[in-house]
């Protein structure tokens, strides 16, 4: 996978993850072009399309488009399943995810994506183990943020 984008029906980019080094200028150009192409397509059209030297796989969930660019030899159906699995993980974590969850908790959305995909390849297919890793990270963060007494800070309590 080259990159993954999440954007709204209004063309607002909500999340982007790039797995291949690309300049900012080129990224912006690619995002703009791809959003125009995907948003112009009718709902009944195929979720796969040829774009530049890549294949694009996208799926709309509510008001968000989840869009992945893959190499020519990669499987479109597996990529569609990866998108669906990511949405399932977001749903499990947020409880019926919506665009506002992504906007206000974008760091969690990126963290979930990073637990699921690494370098554009699937890291873990098990929803349970990905969610368990996220829960553990949340617990660590809560421990770090919880107030401690001076004695606890010094390791004396």
From Swiss-Prot:
An MF annotation (GO) of this entry: clathrin adaptor activity
GO biological process: intracellular protein transport; vesicle-mediated transport
Main location: Golgi
Compartments, record wording: Golgi apparatus; Cytoplasmic vesicle membrane; Membrane, Clathrin-coated pit
Modified residues (Phosphoserine): 146
The keyword Translocase is assigned to this record: no
Protein family per UniProt: Belongs to the adaptor complexes small subunit family.
Name of the protein in question: AP-1 complex subunit sigma-1A
Protein source organism: Bos taurus (Bovine)
């Amino acid at each position: 996978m080259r990159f993954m984008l999440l954007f709204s029906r209004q063309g607002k980019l909500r999340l982007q993850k790039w797995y291949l080094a690309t300049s900012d200028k080129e990224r912006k150009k690619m995002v703009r072009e791809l959003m125009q192409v995907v948003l112009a397509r009718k709902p009944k059209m195929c979720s796969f399309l040829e774009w530049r030297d890549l294949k694009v796989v996208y799926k709309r969930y509510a008001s968000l488009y989840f869009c992945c660019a893959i190499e020519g030899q990669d499987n479109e159906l597996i990529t569609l399943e990866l998108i669906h699995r990511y949405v399932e993980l977001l749903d499990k974590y947020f409880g019926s995810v919506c665009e506002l969850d992504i906007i206000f908790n974008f760091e969690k959305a990126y963290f979930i994506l990073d637990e699921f995909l690494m370098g554009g390849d699937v890291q873990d297919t098990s929803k349970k183990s990905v969610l368990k890793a996220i829960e553990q990270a949340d617990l660590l963060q809560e421990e770090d943020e919880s107030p401690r007494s001076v004695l606890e800070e010094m390791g004396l309590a």
